[in-house]
Amino acid sequence: MSHRKFSAPRHGSLGFLPRKRSSRHRGKVKSFPKDDPSKPVHLTAFLGYKAGMTHIVREVDRPGSKVNKKEVVEAVTIVETPPMVVVGIVGYVETPRGLRTFKTVFAEHISDECKRRFYKNWHKSKKKAFTKYCKKWQDDAGKRQLDKDFSSMKKYCQVIRVLAHTQMRLLPLRQKKAHLMEIQVNGGTVAEKLDWARERLEQQVPVSQVFGQDEMIDVIGVTKGKGYKGVTSRWHTKKLPRKTHRGLRKVACIGAWHPARVAFSVARAGQKGYHHRTEINKKIYKIGQGYLIKDGKLIKNNASTDYDLSDKSINPLGGFVHYGEVTNDFVMLKGCVVGTKKRVLTLRKSLLVQTKRRALEKIDLKFIDTTSKFGHGRFQTVEEKKAFMGPLKKDRIAKEEGA
């Protein structure tokens, strides 16, 4: 900032340095919520996949506010959350230098989509992962060893986490390799946590057992990648005057002569996006149920409300752009979340005790928009579109060919 007439704050935060590509694709939970033994045993996190955005209409319940009892339109994000499968239990002991892994126990049967996570190239591999380990569950000596492991975990461990993976075959994605993560089990005693986890080995855990309606959660993920960007785009520094020699989307002064180095705090060109970020306080507007078969019929009606009784699913006409159809359970979050469509997101219970009125507000949805997100959508359902458009030429041609 040499020879400037007025002082000015620096551009861009130094709190997110180094701005480089994230080493991991899946958002990492760096701290779980504090354990409270008085609460029932529960999981503290879940994995989901970003499908896309839409908007909703709801009535605000905020007495004293100007918008109280008025309708508001708000943007929401749909995150598809198929049930996760528990495949292991990890026990931790507390040491003066933090937590240390004490024992890890895997389930007897582990699906191929989970085993793929342990291989670089599944196609060329012998696919032998866990073949020796699973025999522990079958012979007497192995069973005795497992019982011994569980009893020692009950005796020595302070923290219990479960290993759970997503079910990629239920999603409209090409990826076959499941995402695997450790999820901390909170509530109850250590013995109760272990019994809870042992009962759920190889079982599916739905998102409705982890989060509740109107809950505030945190979303952890990796942002959209933008590639190598110049200093103006990356740090939002001021453009130089038009007549500037050798370019104007630059930083004019990158430091003093001495020290004869460029300081780390000076804005420079480089990687933008694909950074690991944690966004706190995202409100759950709805936990929706996936498609289900009832009395031999496929029920898709998961976007109706008490005010909008039309039979429609959460999917917009033509599906979510660059994603497809959401057929499993989903979580509707207020506002936007990090990452591109199809990006895996880690949903975590809030670390804070929520006391604000906005956080505790009850959400009553009046309407969920399901118009096409590709262009200017006009119709909420296929039936509505057919009724408006009338018989189409392509329908007549198809009918003639069929006849």
Curated annotation (Swiss-Prot):
Pfam families given in the database record: Ribosomal_L3
Residues that bear Tele-methylhistidine: H245
Biased composition (Basic residues): 18-31
Modified residues (Phosphoserine): S13, S304
InterPro entries tied to this protein: L3_arc_euk, Ribosomal_L3_dom_3_arc_sf, Ribosomal_uL3, Ribosomal_uL3_CS, Transl_B-barrel_sf
Function (record text): Component of the large ribosomal subunit. The ribosome is a large ribonucleoprotein complex responsible for the synthesis of proteins in the cell.
Protein name: Large ribosomal subunit protein uL3
Organism: Oryctolagus cuniculus (Rabbit)
